[in-house]
Amino acid sequence: MVSRTLSLSMSLFRAHLVFYRCALNLNSSYNFGFLVAMTFVLQIITGITLAFRYTSEASCAFASVQHLVREVAAGWEFRMLHATTASFVFLCILIHMTRGLYNWSYSYLTTAWMSGLVLYLLTIATAFLGYVLPWGQMSFWGATVITNLLSPIPYLVPWLLGGYYVSDVTLKRFFVLHFILPFIGCIIIVLHIFYLHLNGSSNPAGIDTALKVAFYPHMLMTDAKCLSYLIGLIFLQAAFGLMELSHPDNSIPVNRFVTPLHIVPEWYFLAYYAVLKVIPSKTGGLLVFMSSLINLGLLSEIRALNTRMLIRQQFMTRNVVSGWVIIWVYSMIFLIIIGSAIPQATYILYGRLATILYLTTGLVLCLY
């Protein structure tokens, strides 16, 4: 039984990581999918290590984090690695998604695109849950503001809070979910790879080509080279950047009676935080936020229709879609800047314009 299981595992390993055929003209942008998987593994390793010392009790959570950083051997390295790798997870996912948009991967890799979108949503949820765990001022008030903005969702937010406000029960639930969700994410990554290899990966030319090589050693070596660069960047940021990616207010214990001057979540939340912030109605902001995510899902579903594929082949050029993707990227960067700004009238106006541009580009990509 053991030998049969081992033989099956090795056959799957050889099929997907040795003999799998991929196009010869793949460039470095195709390595970010592999980097996403590796950053997930690094996050799980550092997260489990940190969980040994963390206390999910409202009265002790902040003190346990400070004890971990100041007194535990190599504690600050693991915390900085965990926080820094979280940023690189989102950076790799966003670059991977942008490459998929730019090269039309969503039009004929529908199941792979949808599984990747589910992974993106799961990563956002996991990061938000982990953002609250240090139990500093910015974590507490950021969780309070964001859960308040998401409160129109029935049942979900009250169940997560465990009451009427962010409390000790909320912290315990966030810790448990933050521990479990990355393992679910690993399952989705495996499904994503399965769906990708089931249909075959795309290539920059956007056409089927007979020039294919085995995954090993060609692609595996390029993946290893990019992974070495990524690990170097992560360790440089973790060792020398330290708390640059965090907010100073998060080093202050929670005070329910003092609100920070400006609520600023992590940079990878800022685009969607800006969408929620610039819409005066909570329900309206939530609908726009959900629409921005649904747009990404509709891309693969609409483009899978034969009629849309025929229209694309007859009346559209590659440069049109590439141009709209570039506008989509710029609108998201602009939303990130607006999300980090103080909510004044000028920034709110620019944020609404950027939100309209972001949604419009998504709809245009769906129609094309």
UniProtKB/Swiss-Prot annotation:
**Keyword Heme among UniProt keywords:** yes
Q: Which residues bind heme b b562?
A: H82, H178
Example GO CC term: the record gives: mitochondrial inner membrane
Q: Which InterPro entries match?
A: Cyt_b/b6_C, Cyt_b/b6_C_sf, Cyt_b/b6_N, Cytb/b6-like_sf, Cytochrome_b_N_euk/bac, Di-haem_cyt_TM
Show the Pfam families listed in the entry: Cytochrom_B_C, Cytochrome_B
How is this protein named in the record?
Cytochrome b
Q: What's a BP term from Gene Ontology annotated to this protein?
A: mitochondrial electron transport, ubiquinol to cytochrome c
Q: What does this protein do?
A: Component of the ubiquinol-cytochrome c reductase complex (complex III or cytochrome b-c1 complex) that is part of the mitochondrial respiratory chain. The b-c1 complex mediates electron transfer from ubiquinol to cytochrome c. Contributes to the generation of a proton gradient across the mitochondrial membrane that is then used for ATP synthesis.
This protein's gene is called: MT-CYB
